[in-house]
């Protein structure tokens, strides 16, 4: 009788032990997946930084266009005084927009690297790694954001030499570069999504060119939104670049940060949405 009782207790405890074992294995598996994802993310960042260190020509050549925007367009339009800028010199007014245009140019064409890696088979080998596609997309987007910030750091001293007066507040300047980093990472994720749709480099280049300039002109980068036609004003309100320009202009030029919370919220929402969409579509890149 006592033996049967002990056996029954053992039978009851056995499932509990098995459940605890399965639960521990599950937690261990999740921990390994998370660690793999973090390693993959940092591996992507390290890969891009190595590329940047070994080939800086691309960064310097892409800095030429924004420098021309400031040096030629900015100085000429400053003499015309045709655009109301709220008392801010015109070259100062457009500097945040030019910085963002140059960084977004880097980010939007980041997907071209993805297309090339797919064509050469490199991407397929990278995707064999156990890390999640979310880690891959976020890692690559962070790396692209770093490249974009390096691009902006080249243009920044040139703007100072051209007479642009920045707010002498290191916290504001660092926050402005954080905005550049966040919006650039978001556009890099958008570029990865586009790369999953466009199967050739030629198609990707065409769509990239068609994306950058309309976004640039349909924002407050060169002129206030109130100067736009009503239909274009609605587009500008939905344009994430508008909020990034407003944030950087307030932090670097005017010192007005009253809209910073709204601007940052809009940028973060944009980043979250495009990260999710890009991660979902990333596996289709190798199909």
Language-model features: locations:
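Aromatic- and glycine-rich beta-strand/loop motifs that create alpha-glucan
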Residues: 29-65
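Short amphipathic alpha-helical coupling elements at transmembrane boundaries
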Residues: 43, 47-51, 121-128, 196-199, ...
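Hydrophobic alpha-helical transmembrane segments of multi-pass membrane transport proteins
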Residues: 68-75, 90-162, 182-183, 187, ...
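Short cytosolic juxtamembrane segments of multi-pass membrane proteins
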Residues: 280-287
